[in-house]
């Protein structure tokens, strides 16, 4: 892993966040940023900032790094702690509302250089 970035306590449920994270996992950084920029999901803007942060971390770590070779190697979404709210209902009852949150982690890595096909594999 070249660089990582974490976004904790994001105020969107992990289920909704995973829908957008699945779009960028395994893509190059340029493709992932374009996908997030034109996504209509609300969480895409936060994930775009997170990806920009991971990219800045990679450039800070190695200034000579070729940014075009970076890919989203790992992207995980975990449940965060829910905020508990109450809603008044009839006959003096209270229903609990859970405002869910999530933790997002992104790791960038360099794509390996494509090796030439082996001679033995070519003979088969």
Walk through the language-model features, giving the residues of each.
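Structured, basic alpha/beta domains of bacterial-type, RNA-associated proteins
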Residues: 1-23, 27-124
């Amino acid at each position: 892993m070249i660089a990582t970035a974490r976004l904790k306590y994001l105020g969107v449920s992990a289920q909704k966040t995973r829908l957008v994270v699945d779009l960028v996992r395994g893509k190059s950084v340029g493709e992932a940023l374009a996908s997030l920029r034109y996504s209509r999901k609300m969480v895409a803007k936060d994930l775009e900032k997170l990806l920009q942060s991971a990219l800045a971390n990679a450039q800070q770590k190695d200034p000579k790094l070729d940014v075009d070779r970076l890919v989203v190697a790992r992207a995980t979404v975990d449940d965060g702690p829910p905020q508990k709210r109450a809603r008044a209902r009839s006959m003096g009852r209270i229903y609990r509302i859970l405002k869910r949150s999530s933790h997002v982690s992104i790791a960038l890595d360099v794509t390996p250089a494509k090796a030439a096909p082996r001679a033995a594999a070519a003979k088969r």
